[in-house]
């Protein structure tokens, strides 16, 4: 049985990850959130579920974070914000606290302890390779509209990569996201999909985290629809 920690459990992506994980009885969930009541309202399946442990607290509570991520296979960093304000550092603060928690766990453990992978929700918009097919007029608009949020993500990636010698990270980079049904997904290192649902995105994140061959460690990973033509006929960049 594999255990996964989700930081940002009440957000669209975090709740979708939990819903997908709970489809299998072989998964255990450590759900980290600021408001347990809100989480239970959003995802009733977590109530009295023996495969779910809820941790209520701040992303700055390193002790509680250590309890949450200890013994897990992967940690999903999906704490996000839509507020594009100067000095935004929601993602960096979360990543910093997680690294501090892992340092604490490592210091207290016996040699050879296997630490969890970190799976960061980032964006294809800040990736020159994945975003290379975006229209030349569109990407600058997106970068300007969420400039501080994107800078926070960019610096978070730099920070996590600086710890790559002892902690593996995967950088998940979708394009547009929507609240929609699951339509099937596939992982890619070369493309981005114009729009994909949170359910499909989260399924892709779980697949990358569960990969025992470590093919996605340290990589920028896109998640696209398994049948690419379904939405592109309606939501084309052209």
UniProtKB/Swiss-Prot annotation:
Pathway assigned to this chain's UniProt record: Secondary metabolite biosynthesis
EC supergroup of this enzyme: oxidoreductase
GO-annotated molecular function: monooxygenase activity
InterPro entries: NAD(P)-bd_dom (IPR016040), NAD(P)-bd_dom_sf (IPR036291)
Domain of life: Eukaryota
UniProtKB keywords: Monooxygenase, Oxidoreductase
Pfam families: NAD_binding_10 (PF13460)
Gene3D superfamilies: NAD(P)-binding Rossmann-like Domain (3.40.50.720)
EC number of this enzyme: 1.-.-.-
Protein purpose: Oxidoreductase; part of the gene cluster that mediates the biosynthesis of the dimeric xanthones cryptosporioptides. The pathway begins with the synthesis of atrochrysone thioester by the polyketide synthase dmx-nrPKS. The atrochrysone carboxyl ACP thioesterase dmxR1 then breaks the thioester bond and releases the atrochrysone carboxylic acid from dmx-nrPKS. Atrochrysone carboxylic acid is decarboxylated by the decarboxylase dmxR15, and oxidized by the anthrone oxygenase dmxR16 to yield emodin. Emodin is then reduced to emodin hydroquinone by the oxidoreductase dmxR7.
Family, as annotated: Belongs to the avfA family.
Protein name: Oxidoreductase dmxR7
Organism this protein belongs to: Cryptosporiopsis sp. (strain 8999)
Lineage: Eukaryota, Fungi, Dikarya, Ascomycota, Pezizomycotina
Gene field: dmxR7
């Amino acid at each position: 049985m594999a255990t996964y920690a989700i930081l940002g459990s009440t957000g669209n992506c975090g709740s979708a990850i939990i819903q997908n994980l709970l489809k299998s009885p072989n998964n255990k969930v450590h759900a980290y959130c600021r408001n347990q009541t809100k989480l239970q309202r959003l995802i009733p399946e977590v109530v009295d579920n023996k495969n779910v442990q809820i941790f209520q607290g701040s992303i700055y509570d390193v002790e509680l974070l250590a309890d949450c991520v200890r013994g897990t296979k992967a940690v999903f960093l999906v704490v996000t914000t839509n507020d594009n304000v100067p000095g935004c550092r929601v993602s960096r603060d979360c990543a910093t606290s997680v690294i501090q928690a892992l340092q604490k766990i490592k210091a207290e453990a016996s040699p050879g302890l296997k630490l969890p992978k970190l799976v960061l929700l980032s964006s294809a918009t800040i990736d020159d390779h994945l975003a290379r097919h975006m229209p030349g007029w569109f990407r600058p608009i997106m970068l300007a509209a969420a400039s501080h949020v994107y800078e926070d993500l960019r610096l978070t990636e730099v920070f996590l990569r600086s710890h790559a010698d002892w902690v593996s990270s995967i950088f998940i980079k979708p394009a547009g996201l929507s609240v929609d049904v699951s339509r099937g997904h596939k992982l890619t290192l070369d493309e981005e999909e114009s729009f994909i649902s949170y359910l499909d995105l989260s399924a892709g994140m779980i697949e990358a985290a569960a990969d025992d061959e470590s093919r996605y460690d340290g990589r920028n990973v896109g998640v696209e629809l398994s049948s690419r033509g379904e939405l592109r006929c309606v939501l084309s960049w052209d």
